[in-house]
Amino acid sequence: MQQYRGFKDAHPECVLFFRMGDFYEMFDEDARTVSKAIGLTLTQRGNGIDMAGVPHHAAEGYMRRMVEQGFRVAVCEQLQDPAEAKGVVERGITRIVTPGTLVDESLLTDNQTNLLCAMRCNDKIIHIAVAEISTGLFELHRVAVDRLDDALERLGIAEVIVGEDEETIISVIEHHGISLTKRPAWHFDATEGAALLKKQFGVTTLSGFGIDDDDPIVGVAGAILEYIGVTQASTDAFVHLRTPSLQESSDFVSLDATTIRSLEIEQTIRGNSSEGSLLWVMQRCKTAMGKRLLRRWLCEPLAQRRAIEQRQAIVEVFADDATLRSTIQQSLDQVQDIARIAGRVATGRVTPRDVVALGTSLFGCDEIANELTGDALKSISEELTSLATKLKPLAEMITSRCIESPPTHMRDGGLFVDGFDAELDEARSLQRDAGQWLSNYQAQIVEETNIGTLKVGYNRVFGYYIEVSRAQADRVPDNFTRKQTLKNAERYITPELKTFEDRVLSAESMALTREQQLFKELCSSISECIHNIVAFADMIARLDTLACFADVAMLYGYVRPSIVDEPILEIQDGRHPVLDRLLQDRFVPNDCVLNESPLALITGPNMAGKSTYIRQVAIITLLAHTGSFVPAKSATIGLVDRIFTRVGANDELHAGQSTFMVEMVETANILNNATRNSLVILDEIGRGTSTLDGLSLAWAIAESLSGVGCRTLFATHYHELTALADRDSNITNLHVTVREWNDEIVFLYRIAQGRTDRSYGIHVAKIAGVPKNVVDRANEVLNTLTVHNAQASDEATSHIPAEPQMGLFTEYLPSPLVEELKQIDINALSPMEAFELLREFNRRASGEDEH
């Protein structure tokens, strides 16, 4: 217990998994913690110490469950064979398992990244280093303080390392529920960071990475390297990390957290399900690496036309050649997750199955490279061919030395084939010959003793033995030594059998020891090639994702969009990719043109497709910037710098923000940051306040965005806004068409030019199941109000002054009768009182009393 407490005192923030033989044991408070967290049985030792344990072969699953609940696990292993220990077995911490440092296959999800992040704020800029230990990813980012939420949403961070004094960052991280690791400020020192980076990448200056030695981001990068070394208990744990790349924000279209959620890129708003998301539609990658890259590309669209068109050219080759696409995808389907295998090699967590999977995957490199022909694929083909040449010796080494169906763990032995290592062959020969020797020996002693029922056997507890029935026991010779007494038999050992047993058991140990040594040497050879393996993994991921784009395009009828520098948007027969897949041939496509009039006001009934329309335009624009083809008959997309959305508030009541407050905060972000090159979609601004306030805000917001000149789709239920198109050439009106027939309406889901002045809300209420008497009464009230409010509404909007004089806006708002009507409690009125009140309103609205 003294040894245990020493390790526990050194890592008080962790639950300590303490290896004792075939189990990991937890004691005292740790035992109570795991018992409560994951339901392990709590027991006590003789001295009253609480304890709990898990079998070593199942420990990874328990560790994962602990980490998922926010705990950190320190793993303390036996560093020597207990049989050779003269006192307490030597032990040591071999790794610390945290949310951002997972490397074992059982702890990770194939299609999701697991990013570790370090942050430091300097002059209102947050410097960020991002690493993924399991794949070797290493990137540097800079974001403004007010854009931290967006960065967290876009990157999908599992754990953040931050200085203890970074209150602003800490509060944001805690709000997101991300695992937080606080470190003293000196861990982020730029001088120490520069030294670590130079040592890691073998350079004398960091200028080749686009950063200076004293840049604050260097300290952040150093902090993440130091943390990886601590958690993996090795300075070799980050040998596979790529050289740090500084990500320039101008290279990517900016998507804030609201946009990623609103467009349902990764998961749906309702249910938080991946099924029904954009990623769900686009996911036809064959490799785990491709699946992770696809998610990254969808959240980080390209902003440079040349980079987009380079991707498009490759997608087009695959789209036009079904045979090539099929061949490549079949080859990719055989490639294992070599990026994460490389990570496990670097961290010492690699298994025999990993090694064999790596060898098989590397052999496919040649085949894939040979299939890639043509100008568009030339650079990928050349790079893959170069990597194949470099990695071929390693692939041959692995496949020639290892069996095709390897054991799960090296402790089981049996990984290597016969014939390539003489020492291993000799040990195995002794094991194989054991069966024949035992058979011969049994025949010999049966003949010598004349005991026909005598048998030679083996079990793990007693080893080898000679078994004789009780009835024949008095006939055994003197050189038989009794070893075990059974109910109906006696078991013996002889000097010859004991000598044989020692030789066989020694051979088993020799074979396993030799295999473990050979495995270590093989892993060392893999480590020498690790940077080429990581480069190969990157190329495979890119190729897989581009082939995936082509596969989706051909499967669902997507086209290559034209990318232009001018701020225009022309989409013919555009479709929402998710609904198009779900509804198949029943989805109604629509055009969108935002050129001379970049702001379109869209009116029409509820449930008629306004929200779907504006979302599909945003998603088509996003897909075009990833290099993918798009769901349309044709499309010309002008480059955008940002995509903004305001398409339905999610209440943030826990943060003290109402639905309307969230709506206004998100709208403020758009108004303060949108540029002429942005795309903005707005859905029903102003619903969370009074009619007059909402209309006023919507009007002013539309005018402001018109002034910016950004491409905007503004869906609204305020029909008064359509008057803006009469006075502002930047604004045009669109509406969703319906067909009226026998007092019923049919939604056509078609977008057409012009305005509409009806919302058909009562019809929507009817089909939603509102009782008939309520629907009938609503129609009566609507007919009365429509007649008397139409003139007042038209007059009010016609008198609204241009934007510079908006201080006079409220003098010309629609009739105050609307506000008075909203204050009436209908249930408190008798029929006669209601009639009299309606007649009074009628008289006033008609101008008999006041105009």
Model regions: which residues?
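Active-site phosphate-binding and catalytic loops of NTP-dependent enzymes
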Residues: C76, P99-L108, T235, A376-I380, ...
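Conserved catalytic alpha/beta cores of large enzymes that bind or transform nucleotide phosphates
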Residues: I157-G163, L497-C529, F629-A632, T636
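Charged, surface-exposed helical/loop "interaction arms" that form contiguous linear patches used
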Residues: T347, T351, G364, S379, ...
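Short flexible coil/turn linkers enriched for glycine and charged/polar residues
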Residues: A10-P12, V67-Q69, D110-N111, N122-I125, ...
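ATPase nucleotide-binding head domains, primarily ABC-like/P-loop NTPase cores
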Residues: D28-A31, D214, K286, W297, ...
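C-terminal tails and terminal domains of large nucleic-acid-associated
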Residues: P814-H851
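Amphipathic heptad-repeat alpha-helical coiled-coil/stalk segments that mediate oligomerization
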Residues: F188-L196, V203, V253-T259, I265, ...
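Charged catalytic and DNA/RNA-contacting regions of genome-maintenance
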Residues: M1-V317, Q330-D333, D337-A346, V350-A443
